[in-house]
């Protein structure tokens, strides 16, 4: 895959539930602590190395940000690092929280 794909929150939720992909959140630490999707890895410059070490490059990665814009750049970056399949989640955490309020965790 040379280009990431966009995915809606319903499809992302299904892939996460079926363990077909991993979910990363690239928002700032304060926003992440105020609420994030359950089963999310907080991907930052500081945690990127650990994420790449602990996740297979053939496991699809779904990238979440605030509204679905910043995630596109991060998704493209992960492809360039060697991940085979990467998705950018349309609507970001804002859409996730609206559609799946019970699937939101709080704290770091």
Curated annotation (Swiss-Prot):
**What family does the database annotate?**
Belongs to the GlpE family.
What is this protein called in UniProt?
A: Thiosulfate sulfurtransferase GlpE
Is Cytoplasm found in the keyword set?
Answer: yes
Tell me where it resides.
Cytoplasm
Question: Does the UniProt entry include the keyword Cell inner membrane?
Answer: no
PROSITE patterns linked to this entry:
RHODANESE_3
What NCBIfam families does its record include? PRK00162.1
Question: Known catalysed reaction(s)?
Answer: thiosulfate + hydrogen cyanide = thiocyanate + sulfite + 2 H(+); thiosulfate + [thioredoxin]-dithiol = [thioredoxin]-disulfide + hydrogen sulfide + sulfite + 2 H(+)
The gene is glpE
- GO MF term set: thiosulfate-cyanide sulfurtransferase activity
Q: What residues sit in the active site?
A: 65
Q: What is the E.C. number?
A: 2.8.1.1
Q: Give a GO cellular-component term.
A: cytoplasm
Keywords in alphabetical order: Cytoplasm, Transferase
């Amino acid at each position: 895959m040379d280009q990431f794909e966009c995915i809606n929150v319903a499809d992302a939720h299904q892939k996460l539930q079926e363990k077909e992909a991993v979910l990363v959140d690239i928002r700032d630490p304060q926003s992440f602590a105020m609420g994030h999707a359950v089963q999310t890895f907080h991907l930052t410059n500081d945690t990127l190395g650990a994420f790449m070490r602990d996740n297979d490059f053939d496991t699809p990665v779904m990238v979440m940000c605030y509204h679905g814009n910043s995630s596109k750049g991060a998704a493209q970056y992960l492809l360039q690092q060697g991940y085979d399949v990467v998705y950018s989640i349309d609507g970001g955490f804002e859409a996730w929280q609206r559609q799946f309020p019970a699937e939101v965790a709080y704290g770091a």
